[in-house]
A protein has these predicted regions:
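Conserved glycine-rich cofactor-binding loop
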Residues: 16-17
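Rossmann-fold cofactor-recognition segment
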Residues: 55-77
Length: 257
């Protein structure tokens, strides 16, 4: 009797649209089963069906397994419940892809941001990221085979272009993501023990957040995340692309932050 090797699992947040959807679809086509997380149940189920149809069209079968989890990532209790549901019902993931996020109000300079707006943006962009990593990554670290990829932003850089102020909650939340990634990567051995932790700047892409006039498509914005999920890694390698983790990537290049 023939047995088939279990397919690797990828968990993707923000999976119902934009960068999260494009990342989820690309990983499915590359052989990953999916755990999809989003707030809107109708949109998420529609996205999951599009992904399943694309998989069937490319592979000629319906072997892809998708699981959907409805979660408002602004609500810590919902995040905890979603983590529990995933960890109790699914195997240890190989990929944890955190592609969700929210923009702050356009006039949200530091001294003009109220408590409600600050907490909303931090809850979604940073607190939920910490919760998801803290709840799911320990098993990945124990398995010594996993990749955590978090969508950050060039607006979260403290050096280089795009650091002139404004959009305070958004910029600061993304700077926090960059710091979390660096800290966790160092704590887990910078890839030497099998766990890679990276942040990406997808650049201005045509999504609900980025708007229809953005220069990049959502597929282009997701490309570096997909590469990070599948790249060969060797901590003794010669190029940044094969040996570095714990950094911020843009177009498959390391950028200072």
């Amino acid at each position: 009797m023939e047995t088939t090797a279990p397919r690797p699992l990828a968990i993707i947040t923000g999976a119902s649209r934009g960068l999260g959807f494009e990342t989820a679809k690309a990983l499915a086509l590359r052989g990953f089963d999916l755990a999809l997380i989003a707030k809107d149940s109708q949109r998420l189920e529609s996205a999951a069906q599009v992904i399943r149809d694309a998989y069937t069209q490319q592979h000629g079968n319906s072997d892809l397994r998708t699981s959907s989890f409805i979660c408002d990532l602004e609500q810590p209790e919902q995040v905890r419940e979603t983590i529990a549901a995933i960890t109790h019902s699914l195997p240890v993931p190989q990929i944890l892809m955190l592609a969700h996020g929210v923009m702050s109000e356009k006039m949200s300079k530091t001294l003009k941001t109220n408590d409600t707006e600050w907490r909303r943006v931090m809850a979604i962009n940073l607190d939920s990221v910490f919760q998801l990593v803290n709840g799911i990554a320990p098993a990945m670290a124990d398995a010594r085979n996993g990749r955590i990829i978090i969508f950050s932003a060039c607006l979260g850089r403290m050096s280089g272009p795009g650091n002139a102020g404004g959009l305070a909650p958004y910029r600061i939340s993304k700077a926090g993501v960059n710091a979390l990634v660096r800290n966790l990567a160092h704590e887990t051995g910078l890839g030497a023990r099998g766990l890679l932790v990276d942040a990406i700047c997808p650049n201005h892409s045509r999504t609900d957040m980025g708007g229809s006039d953005a220069p990049r498509s959502a597929e282009e914005g997701a490309a570096t995340a997909i590469w990070l999920a599948t790249r060969p890694f060797n901590p003794a390698g010669t190029s940044d692309q094969e040996k570095l983790t714990g950094v911020l990537w843009e177009d498959q290049q390391v950028v200072p932050w």
